[in-house]
Amino acid sequence: MSHPSLGLPPSDLTAGLPAAADRMRAAKERLAGRALEVALAETPGMRERYDEAGLRRRLRDAELMIERVALCVASGDTQYAKGYADMVSPLYRRRFVPLDDQIALCNGIRAALPGVLPPTELPAAGEALDAAIEVYRWHRRLAGDARKKNAILQFLYKGG
């Protein structure tokens, strides 16, 4: 994605696979539901961490990520997913949402996409999801993430 104040042209949303992006947007709710199911099945303790309202928020998060991945697929540029992940990471930290749960949602989206996209279009979406996961992993290392800490290191650090 070009920066507008640098005088560079904006990204072309027809440079990638706009038809695939349209199919993703049309099936956004179904994809998000399946992605959340996969994330809940693959991530131990995720179902216990959230009540019904929290699960609805994670479902909405999956829908928003699918929209960003669709933009990446349409433009052929992963910057939309990277920028979104970078923008929302502090918000999740403030809400005590582990970024590992967001990574699980991204992997759930990846597992749900073959129902909508043919195998030739999956790599474009996979690149966008990999870019978002990379950003989430980078932010996960910062202090304040709600992930489970190493008990031994916490004992040594706090002095028990």
Model-identified regions with their sequence ranges:
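Core of compact, soluble alpha-helical bundle domains
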Residues: M1-N107, A111-G160
